[in-house]
Amino acid sequence: NPKSLKKNKLRPHKNDYWCIPKKDDAEFIACMEDVLDVYELPYNPERPVVCMDEKPYQLLGDARKPLPMRPGDNQKTDSEYVRNGTCSIFAFVDPLGGTHHVSVREQRTAFDWAEEIKYLVDVMYPDAEKVILVMDNLNTHKTASLYKRYPADEARRIIKRLEIHYTPKHGSWLDIAEIELNVMTRQCLSR
């Protein structure tokens, strides 16, 4: 009966997704508290805190040219699109130093991650004693990736410049770089 269908505040077509850890997950709590302790550190240019994340992104093109916009009208774009491949977006955020660095690569491999980390320590922070790095525990985010990409002495040199802290499983939202990538996607890339 249409009269019984009243407008309500339920929105089953909308979803907010959260990674909710199991209650009393000791490993989650330990990793979370470690990351939060890192975030409480005062700014120190000799030991900058840098958050790192990466995300895949689908490159799409228009199948047909969008119609010209008119004042007061929305842009009219065809719902059909052309796939132009994918890429990986790497982001480094130094929340206290105010530095943001984003790079785009064709893929996400152990070599790609290792090259980004070398850039971080050698180009972005060449004078820092150590870079305190916060990131998720993705399979390529391991010091072994540096050994896969570089000779052992070079990999070791890079590792000695890092102090790594991993966000907990189901807690990557604690990584400021992930938040920044999500904002960039919503405000820039998805437009």
Regions found by a protein language model. Name each.
Residues 1-22, 48, 54-58:
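Conserved short alpha-helical interface segments
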Residues 128-141:
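Acidic/histidine-rich, metal-coordinating catalytic segments
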Residues 60-62, 142-148:
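A short acidic (Asp/Glu
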Residues 56-57, 96-97, 138-141, 170-173:
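Conserved nucleotide-binding/hydrolysis micro-motifs of P-loop NTPases
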Residues 75-81, 154-176, 191:
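RNase H-like polynucleotidyl transferase catalytic core
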